[in-house]
């Protein structure tokens, strides 16, 4: 119901890709409605972007808002974003099919580092952003969207010591 592909063998932590081969392969049988009565993803979604009929309102999806959307994030959704700077994946994290998934062994798909402090990101400038996230998918959202997301997460954190780092962006264009 989270609208992502679910494999009974691998769960829903998947990349959709295509490989061109000079041979024919046997088609898999698509599975339909692997979710049954489970609504865990709908229940956990912070913005209520998921619906029981397996539809999503991307305008409310935190992954869409923090990765794809380039405008100002609606005020009504900012608090629900919490500390998320790039994506969400709450719906994937709770999916029971992921009990079958295994961590990747491909180093290119691993996170760069564990959680960084918001202050670390608030001290970035555009050049450092490009250097730090070189060869990371985060680079593609661009500096403006990245710092927008960091500022929202910083505001949501209510960490008073971030105030001075946030203030420099009040007149930033």
Regions inferred by a protein language model and the residue ranges of each:
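Catalytic cores of enzyme domains
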Residues: 1-113
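Alpha-helical scaffold domains
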Residues: 69, 73-173
């Amino acid at each position: 119901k989270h609208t992502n592909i679910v494999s009974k063998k691998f769960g829903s932590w998947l990349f959709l890709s295509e490989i061109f081969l000079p041979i024919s392969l046997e088609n898999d049988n698509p599975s339909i409605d692997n979710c049954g009565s489970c609504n865990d993803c709908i229940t956990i979604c912070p913005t209520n972007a998921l619906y029981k009929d397996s539809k999503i309102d991307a305008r409310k999806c935190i992954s869409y808002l923090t990765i794809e959307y380039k405008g100002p994030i609606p005020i009504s959704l900012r608090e629900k974003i919490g500390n998320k700077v790039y994506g969400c994946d709450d719906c994937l994290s709770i999916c029971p099919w992921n009990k079958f998934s295994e961590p990747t062994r491909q180093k290119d798909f691993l996170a760069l580092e564990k959680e960084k402090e918001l202050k670390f990101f608030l001290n970035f400038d555009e050049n450092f952003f490009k250097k730090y996230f070189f060869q990371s998918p985060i680079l593609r959202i661009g500096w403006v969207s990245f710092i927008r997301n960091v500022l929202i997460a910083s505001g949501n954190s209510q960490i008073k010591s971030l105030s001075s780092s946030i203030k420099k962006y009040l007149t930033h264009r």
